[in-house]
Amino acid sequence: MNFKSTVITAMCCFFSFAVLASEKLEKPKLVVGLVVDQMRWDYLYRYYDRYSENGFKRLLNEGFSSENTLIDYVPTYTAIGHSTIYTGSVPAINGIAGNDFIIQATGQNMYCTQDDSVQAVGGEGKVGQQSPKNLLVSTITDQLKLATNFQSKVIGIAIKDRGGILPAGHFANAAYWLDGKTGDWITSTYYMKDLPKWVKGFNKEKVVDQYYKQGWKTLYPIDTYVLSTADDNLYEETFKGEKTPTFPRDLVKLKKENGYELIKSTPQGNTLTLDFAKRAIENEQLGNNPLQVTDFLAVSLSSTDYIGHQFAINSIEIEDTYLRLDRDIADFLAYLDQNIGKGNYTLFLSADHGAAHNPKFFADQKGNSGYFDTKAIRKDLNEKLASKFGVADLVKSLANYQVHLNYEVIEANDVEEDEVIAAAIKLLKKVDGVAFVVDMNEAAESSVPQILRERIINGYNFKRSGAIQLILEPQWFSGSKDGKGTTHGSWNSYDAHIPAVFLGWGVKPGKTTRQTHMTDIAPTIAQILKIEFPNGNIGTPIQEAIEQ
């Protein structure tokens, strides 16, 4: 090689390195998390033929769907689900052991986002005394803030406080939730001292009253809702002021007895949430960050859960809600396309849990089901334990399908904890609807199927969970005889099989039917963003969903 060619080669290498050094790592402008509260996986397909092309169908056709995503723990509740999605962790690690839980060391009842050290901003009282303080690990939103030296903006929005606070994490710029007394969006002093002007402006518009004027009638002729039970039935709860749980509904009239709480249990609650999310994008410049870093908007749609609890999963109300939600999602995606740019954002849709059929409905179809009357069973359990040990009130609570012992009483009366647990287990095994009763001190050796054992251990936080875990038979849940509506909390597929759909920047379209987990969502987003996993993560990125 002569001198001239050597110089040319050296110069080429120099400029190649210079180009490489100047290359910028491409990332999406915005990540949007959509959690649809109480959305069973099968809702993606149950009403598929009635969905528009640009809502759920667009997510499925243009995005990646993990069709067999399961929840890794029991019990399956809202606060735990939101925490798990955003942390890739489970209650044993992240500390969120229920919507409410008991601090075992003190016996104190604790709401998942309760923080008495902060005050409401935009509202009054305990409704605003909320923060992520009780969450023990970082979220994917926290990790984004850390990765960008806190230059990214992170905002959480949900009608439910826990649905906005827990996903937004510890380092969020803001989390907003709805004050049911006023219909206003509020926050707490954990985030700020005063509401931004744009939030105050939105609240002044009294958007909820505008939605009430629309009423609630079915989107299509009611006789086309053939996938649902007849409108007037015994399985649904009425609103205050209603004689029957039937369409159409005059929301202005119902407001007189239900106030602004009413919006939570109507499809317009989802519309309200997404309208507020759009306003946040515009005013906070989410996805158009002047520092050119990725922002994160965590949205939870709470109304699907309120409606499901009140009317159950086979109702016309649920079918109509999802048909309307499909339109809302289509509108929101179109908004993102226009304002952030199609292909410039990454979005995922999932759920915090599913829901069971109403037990009476299921029994009327000749299925096995029933109600576990927690209040009556606790009373009976305490009476029988008192007869054996000579001490009253040994059981404090049966919350979260767990037996919480009254340790103050046990210690004061010098009763052996192990003996109380053994006696309680023996009694509970005789109760109708109980499949398994597990001593949490011996969970790893318990004689239950492995999949159940793993979920029980994952859901157990020894500082915040009960001493005994109850597993009920399928289609049994906590409630009184002939209870209306539905609930959730079990390990069964109707509660624990959830959607996990990814769309947009960094996502490879397609689907998989292999088993994945709720804990896989956060690390998947982390890998797309090329940032570190949350610090309590146990999940694995869904590689098939990621554009390499």
Swiss-Prot record:
A GO MF label: alkaline phosphatase activity
Membrane topology value: Peripheral membrane protein
Extent of motif ATP-binding: 179-187
Cofactor: Mg(2+)
Transmembrane domains' residue ranges: none
Activity regulation details: Completely inhibited by vanadate(3-). Also inhibited by lanthanoid atom and phosphate. Not inhibited by N-ethylmaleimide, 1,3-dicyclohexylcarbodiimide, oligomycin, ouabain, valinomycin, nigericin, thapsigargin, cyclopiazonic acid or fluorescein isothiocyanate.
Keywords: ATP-binding, Calcium, Calcium transport, Cell inner membrane, Cell membrane, Ion transport, Magnesium, Membrane, Metal-binding, Nucleotide-binding, Phosphoprotein, Signal, Translocase, Transport
Enzymatic class: translocase
GO-annotated biological processes: calcium ion transmembrane transport; calcium ion transport; cellular response to magnesium ion
Residues given in the record as a divalent metal cation 2 binding sites: 305, 309, 488
A cellular component term, taken from the record's GO annotations: external side of plasma membrane
UniProt cross-references to Gene3D superfamilies, sorted A to Z: 3.30.1360.150, Alkaline Phosphatase, subunit A (3.40.720.10)
pH dependence: Optimum pH is 8.0 for ATP hydrolysis activity. Loses 50% of the activity at pH 7.0 or 8.5, has less than 20% activity at pH 6.5 and virtually no activity at pH 9.0.
Keyword field contains Membrane: yes
Record: residues binding substrate: 99, 160-162
Enzyme Commission code(s) on record: 7.2.2.10
SUPFAM superfamilies documented for this protein: Alkaline phosphatase-like (SSF53649)
Entry-linked CDD domains: AP-SPAP
Signal peptide range: 1-21
Binding locations of a divalent metal cation 1: 37, 78, 352-353
Catalytic activity: Ca(2+)(in) + ATP + H2O = Ca(2+)(out) + ADP + phosphate + H(+)
Residue positions of the active site: 78 (phosphothreonine intermediate)
Function description: Catalyzes the hydrolysis of ATP coupled with the transport of calcium. Has some hydrolysis activity also with dATP, GTP, UTP, ITP and 4-nitrophenyl phosphate as substrate. No activity with ADP, CTP, acetyl dihydrogen phosphate or AMP-PNP as substrate.
Record-given protein name: Calcium-transporting ATPase
Originating species: Myroides odoratus (Flavobacterium odoratum)
Upper classification of the organism: Bacteria, Pseudomonadati, Bacteroidota, Flavobacteriia, Flavobacteriales
Name of the gene: cda
